[in-house]
Amino acid sequence: MNMKTIEWKDGELVLIDQRKLPDSLEYFRCRDYRDVIYAIKNMVVRGAPAIGVTAAFGVAMAELAGEDVEVAAEEIKASRPTAVNLFWAVDRVMKSESPLDEAITMYMEDMETNRAIGRHGAGLIEDGDTVLTHCNAGALACVDYGTALGVIRAAWDDGKRLTVICDETRPVGQGARLSVWEMQQEGIPVKLITDVAAGYLMQTGMIDKVIIGADRIAEGGVANKIGSLMVALAAKRFNVPFYVAAPMSTFDTENSIYDIEIEERDPAEVLYYGGCRIAPQDTEAINPAFDIVPSDLISGIITEKGILDPL
């Protein structure tokens, strides 16, 4: 994509409003740190690296406005509990003498990091491969370029012919709405499947690799968008290599993956789709936003430093 998910313009943070895609490309302007919290909570911006950079600018905006930065930092941290990049970014900016300069540095680093991830991962993809990805770990999940989709972009730019399979990623549909859109912008062949079709495609030999992103990597496994575990289990059963692509900032070296908080989102996301109710009245729904892929299901973790073993 030739556009940035996040841009700092004239004292405002301008975000692609991902709730509007793919129907329209609109922007959401954050004029203070409270707008940043709204954007993160309501998935105007999503994806661990993008949330981290957005949070960094949120702290900077609080400092520039003369707000209580400590209070702002804690409120920003509380906006989404599972993505470790959020906490890492806020803590890093808080230690800086100039929060705005540090946020801009992190913005630039994110672009460089994603391209390094792409370079390291591109060699895993062979000419003619069909690659399955879950949710959206592309340019829209970062400042630009992406992690999992960055690997696919890099392989495509290397001249490899490939096909991308995106699952829809219920309940919010990030695969259908965002990943398919990104691949179409690049002219990379892409097909959409329902979430429950992934196992069948692997069983019948239609998938050569799986590459997903991550919201947190810790001892014992990886936390990523709900549904990642089912994809990983099918990949293990049918001997399909399963890779995670993420920056080093997504690593949490202080906790077990099973000790982290898994965000529970509004049940309405499950009960409604496209504004239409899809279940009977008075139906109760459970809506965890993430699940955990154990380390033994992961073939490798693609980072800016190379391909690493799972923790």
Curated annotation (Swiss-Prot):
Residues that hold substrate according to the record: 46-48, 80, 174, 224-225
Domain of life: Archaea
GO MF term (any one): S-methyl-5-thioribose-1-phosphate isomerase activity
GO BP: L-methionine salvage from methylthioadenosine
Known EC number: 5.3.1.23
Keyword line: Amino-acid biosynthesis, Isomerase, Methionine biosynthesis
Residues the UniProt record annotates as site (Transition state stabilizer): 135
InterPro entries documented for this protein: IF-2B-related, IF-M1Pi, IF_2B-like_C, Initiation_fac_2B_a/b/d, M1Pi_N, NagB/RpiA_transferase-like
Function: Catalyzes the interconversion of methylthioribose-1-phosphate (MTR-1-P) into methylthioribulose-1-phosphate (MTRu-1-P).
Family: Belongs to the eIF-2B alpha/beta/delta subunits family. MtnA subfamily.
Protein's recorded name: Putative methylthioribose-1-phosphate isomerase
